[in-house]
Amino acid sequence: MENAKMNSLIAQYPLVKDLVALKETTWFNPGTTSLAEGLPYVGLTEQDVQDAHARLSRFAPYLAKAFAETAATGGIIESELVAIPAMQKRLEKEYQQPISGQLLLKKDSHLPISGSIKARGGIYEVLAHAEKLALEAGLLTLDDDYSKLLSPEFKQFFSQYSIAVGSTGNLGLSIGIMSARIGFKVTVHMSADARAWKKAKLRSHGVTVVEYEQDYGVAVEEGRKAAQSDPNCFFIDDENSRTLFLGYSVAGQRLKAQFAQQGRIVDADNPLFVYLPCGVGGGPGGVAFGLKLAFGDHVHCFFAEPTHSPCMLLGVHTGLHDQISVQDIGIDNLTAADGLAVGRASGFVGRAMERLLDGFYTLSDQTMYDMLGWLAQEEGIRLEPSALAGMAGPQRVCASVSYQQMHGFSAEQLRNTTHLVWATGGGMVPEEEMNQYLAKGR
């Protein structure tokens, strides 16, 4: 971006100056509205989420047999919800900032099959595509026991088709493993940030991995191009896919059930704050949409991004969405949080969700490493750096009197708050890699 343009952008949006300086930045969204007002802009409804829920239930018998690790839950891919009181104390001590209410962790980091939040959206979109093909071919009806998809006949049928996706790692892992298990030929286009172990794991499942020297945007573009030349190839578009988004959104109702099971109340007097790491935006956007449908205006969602990849904060704050990238303002998009190394946000998610998100913030790689170490020490839970992005949220919210006043929170409400950090990945990180992460914390 030429200087004059840059100066006028900063004059209009002074916060951009802090982003350019790679400062840890927090922006509370003044444009937040009620669910009733914001919902029409999403372009999807509660019915769409129910359909996704039903589809996952139809596939449950198949998943229970296809992946032994899902047998115990009857083929439902869901993660634990745990309180992390020792981590809460540690954060308060390290940051000299009390966190009112209770701190919880949602362990999508340990979801079965692929060990990340992408096991929600990625697997769902592969299943939705497989179902569509099998129904159209007359090989399947909605009332069938879907475990029949494991038969050689179906493997043979699906092998005529291929799937392609561009990824920084975790989405590729989910889509690659699932597609290969069903019988699709699958190619994952991996950006420069992708970890070597993720590529190796994919190849061990018979997935074709194409590696790029460039970032996420290039990997997605190349994947899209390669798929266009083959009519039997389906490209899963992380930037714009409504199907992926709906796969994530099912988490809302599931979390509501977990809260009920644990006797946790969410209402006007007991607000829920949820902190979601954000890359291109599909995962956190879909989850936030599902949470809003489940808890209405009593849930407040925040997106967390690396200081080197603040694409969603930049896009929503300036209103430019996918028309601007972090590279345009001189930021390099290089971060240890490989799952969040995205320079240009999803235009679909930003525009759909901007009225339903309470805020956005950035944090440095070092902050993620520090918190990664503290969580391992205090709670014995090991995550990858990206998954710690949400952990900085509770301090930011509790420290901001202006945000609390903007929403009219009383001291009583804040005392009754639940802070939920969404841990997005790390359950499958190899030991030696994890030890390198732990060594970087202070």
From Swiss-Prot:
Catalytic activity, reaction form: D-serine = pyruvate + NH4(+)
MF terms in GO: D-serine ammonia-lyase activity; hydro-lyase activity; pyridoxal phosphate binding
Record-linked Gene3D superfamilies: 3.40.50.1100
GO biological-process terms attached to the record: D-serine catabolic process; isoleucine biosynthetic process
EC id: 4.3.1.18
Cofactor(s), names only, from the UniProt record: pyridoxal 5'-phosphate
Keyword field: Lyase, Pyridoxal phosphate
Tree of life domain: Bacteria
Entry keyword Transmembrane: no
Keyword Protein transport assigned: no
Classification via HAMAP family: D_Ser_dehydrat
PANTHER family for this protein: D-SERINE DEHYDRATASE, THREONINE DEHYDRATASE, MITOCHONDRIAL-RELATED
Family the UniProt entry places it in: Belongs to the serine/threonine dehydratase family. DsdA subfamily.
Record protein name field: D-serine dehydratase
Organism annotation: Shigella sonnei (strain Ss046)
Gene that encodes the chain: dsdA
